Each structure stands twice: as structure tokens, then as C-alpha cells.
Amino acid sequence: MFKIFNDVPVPYGLYFQDSATPTFDGIIELHDIVMFYIVVTIVLVSYLLFVIIKNFSNDHISYKYLTHGTTLEIVWTIFPVVILLFIAFPSFILLYLCDEVIDPAMTIKAIASQWYWTYEYSDFIGETGEIVQFDSYIVPTDMLENGQLRMLDVDARIVVPTNTHLRFIVTSRDVIHDFALPSLGIKCDATPGRLNQVSALLQRESVYYGQCSELCGVLHSSMPIALEAVSIDKFLSWLDEQ
């Protein structure tokens, strides 16, 4: 049976794109945990407000003699602290895992410019003796082919193998940009004069889309990112063509 994955933005979408990496699995899980605590807190606070309004709306005298309540003050101090601890611990663990890059099998350097991306496969040397690199520009609307996505497809995609530890090194030639691929759980600033890194392990073959997520000028929306994850054999065949 085939399973359809949502790897692109959809109109009126209210949830995340489908996950393709363990990192994004963790982000979605943390989101669901935090949302659970938020719903519990909202329900509890709403119930308390309802009870207070109901009990004191017709009695204008009794609450005037409530000068303090030590037990109540302890409860409303400890309860938020406990909730914050339950949120903090998994978020700290996930933050560490997202930031740690251990022994990547392949490195891709993403260089942002106004308004396109340059990708360098520094681990591979082409037939000319230079590293494999290429520029990636948006496909104009009037040049789109059937099946291509407006404002998302590019003339040259990043191609990577699945089930391989990848490291993306991100930087910029001019202003601050941002390298973001939602389905991979990646969002990394591209800052001039600085190298930032982020890792990914793609678990399935597909085409993933992202965009520059930092306002970088008049054509900010014309800096899409398209990444195609393929099998090792297909990746090696693609690499031979470069």
C-alpha cells in the first residue's frame, strides 16, 4: 500500500509538514507535549475563573475579608514551576540533539546570495579537478513545467542520499539569509562572515521544499530551496554526471 506524504506547504494548512528526519520527529513530539500542557492549563484556569465568578457574583461581602491565603499562594506558585519543568527538560534534550553534529558522512555548503543559493559538495571532486558546486535559481512562473510548484521549484536541486548523516554548512555572501527546510526540521541562519552548521538524516526518498526565512530584500520570496533525497545508487549516478 502506498502512503502519501505532505512535503510541501498547502493552502490553509494548520499543522506541520510530514517529518522526514529524526530531528523533526522530536520537534513535533515536543510541540504536542507543550500543546497538551497548554490545553490542561487553559481548562483549569477557565474552570477556576468560572467558579470564582459564580460564587462571588451574588455575594459582594465575603471576598472583602479574604486578605491572604498561604495555601493558595503556594499552589499557584508551585504548579506553574512544575509545568515549566516538564516542558523545559525535553526541550533542552532536543536542543542539544539538534545542535550536535557527530561524524557526518557528507558535507554540503549552502551559500546564500541576493537572490539565489550556491551549493558546494566539498567531499567530492569533479572531472575538472574542482569541487562539485552549482547555483540554484527559482524557476519563473512563465517557465514552470507540469508538476512544478510556483515559487518553490528551482533549476538545480540539492541531491542527497537517504539514510546518510549529512551536515549543512550555511553562510552568506551579502546580507543575512536563512536556510529552512520544514520537513527536515532545519532552520539555520546564513550570516556573512560566519559558518553555521546543522545536521540531517533523511529517512525516505522524496523532494522537499523550503525557502529563505529571513527578510533579505525585495526578492526575498524568490529564494526557494529544493532538496531531492534519493537512494545511494541514484546519488552516485547523479554525482557522476556533475
Swiss-Prot record:
Annotated binding of Cu cation A2, by residue: C212, E214, C216, H220
Enzyme class: translocase
Pfam families: COX2, COX2_TM
GO BP: ATP synthesis coupled electron transport
Manner of cofactor binding, per the entry note: Binds a dinuclear copper A center per subunit.
GO MF, one example: cytochrome-c oxidase activity
Ligand binding (Cu cation A1): H177, C212, C216, M223
Transmembrane segments: 34-55, 74-98
Cofactor(s), by name: Cu cation
Principal location class: mitochondrion
Catalytic activity: 4 Fe(II)-[cytochrome c] + O2 + 8 H(+)(in) = 4 Fe(III)-[cytochrome c] + 2 H2O + 4 H(+)(out)
Record-given protein name: Cytochrome c oxidase subunit 2
